[in-house]
From Swiss-Prot:
SUPFAM superfamilies: Amidase signature (AS) enzymes (SSF75304). GO terms for molecular function: ATP binding; glutaminyl-tRNA synthase (glutamine-hydrolyzing) activity. Its EC number is 6.3.5.7. It holds the Pfam family Amidase. The active site is at K75 (charge relay system), S150 (charge relay system), S174 (acyl-ester intermediate). The lineage of its organism: Bacteria, Bacillati, Cyanobacteriota, Cyanophyceae, Synechococcales. It is an enzyme of class 6 (ligase). It comes from Synechococcus elongatus (strain ATCC 33912 / PCC 7942 / FACHB-805) (Anacystis nidulans R2). GO terms for cellular component: glutamyl-tRNA(Gln) amidotransferase complex. It catalyses: L-glutamyl-tRNA(Gln) + L-glutamine + ATP + H2O = L-glutaminyl-tRNA(Gln) + L-glutamate + ADP + phosphate + H(+). GO terms for biological process: translation. Allows the formation of correctly charged Gln-tRNA(Gln) through the transamidation of misacylated Glu-tRNA(Gln) in organisms which lack glutaminyl-tRNA synthetase. The reaction takes place in the presence of glutamine and ATP through an activated gamma-phospho-Glu-tRNA(Gln). This is Glutamyl-tRNA(Gln) amidotransferase subunit A. The keyword Endoplasmic reticulum does not apply.
Amino acid sequence: MASIRELHSQLVRKERSAVEIAEAALQRIETLEPQLKSFLHVTADQAIAQAKAVDQRIAAGEEISLLAGIPIGIKDNLCTRGIPTTCASKILQGFVPPYESTVTQRLAEAGAVAVGKTNLDEFAMGSSTENSAYQTTANPWDLTRVPGGSSGGSAAAVAADECVVALGSDTGGSIRQPAAFCGVVGLKPTYGLVSRYGLVAYASSLDQIGPFSRSVEDTAILLGAIAGHDPKDATSLKVEVPDYTQFLKPSLAGIKVGVITETVTDSPAGQAMQAALEVLQGLGAEIREISCPRFAYGLPAYYIIAPSEASANLARYDGVKYGYRVEEAETLIDMYCRTRAEGFGSEVKRRIMIGTYALSAGYYDAYYLKAQKVRTLIKQDFEAAFAEVDVLVSPTTPTTAFKAGEKTADPLSMYLSDLMTIPVNLAGLPGLSLPCGFDEAGLPYGLQIIGNVLREDQVLHTAYAYEQATEWHLRQPAL
């Protein structure tokens, strides 16, 4: 499938109709889903109806937005009115939201065509999409490997050309890590730039919605459509949203790029980053080594803060108002306990228990309060770094995609795949992953580009220049 601009050009020239584009995407989904399992719900009827509306506007001579008629996948933790939203959890089986999330509403108003809801780790808790209660998504580059998580369905769908772009959410790396594993572009915006209204909460001080695509330009276009203040979200920032595509330039002259020394290794992922740095330098960037001494403490701090917030957010799932409820409970308390025991998967229950323990009276200071202090120190490290450079780079992940089942019995090993991405969430910064090479098995590496608060312009500029100087993004999985 072509890029957003290419499809837009075909539509306005009437070379293809929006219905034809939607039907092609739906046919691709039908062909690949038995092996890929990217989607939990395919919304074919809605997609065709939305596409017909775009065609009618074109026929009437109306101007259409760049996203009009563009097939998009939506992570299944974003509320979609009249369409099931399960968060890949048994406890939300059959839940149909009565309202629409702000981001999906904005995309619908722009004329985007939603082809379905994508798979994820249950309640966005995981790094492989193996924690879904319904199915395990495969990596398009190697069907025996994971696509990453928690937004693995969205990343795999974009990589496999089932849709042009997709939405994900990122709490500790859940957009960037699967983007790296699937060889696509994934952006976590500055905290508060994109409304969280209608996003089913995991850890509210960390969650942020962002785009997946196969190019930096498509990422910039999608970000421009979903960003901006929303009075329905108390954490939404009151900022002007620029046309992010104006910052996409091929030269990096005058840009200072900092390499986080704590992420520099001789590993294959580290070597891929070093090769990328040479490209950036050749484009005119000044490369500096920058130390973020508390970077490695992000992982343990995150696994106190995020589960603590999750234990509070997930208290609302009790079998009373919506979703799964056990039958024939003896008492109200029995119904609560059995509903949650049967409705939540093992990883979700593990994180609820960790969070409840960290917030308990005797341990609050030792764990939660200390983790928040570490979070502040990490933020200060980034502030010091951005006083010297414009963007920071690191590998997105320590490795390429691992085999399905390889890490499920070892949660700590699984958690380490988010080692490079978590500090960015703790500091509320924008971070992007894009392809920067392939290993001997033909699996993609990701380069992470981190910006200062609300400096998505510099992140996208750096990413675009690198992308245009290389050919990694042009490779596609053989499906």
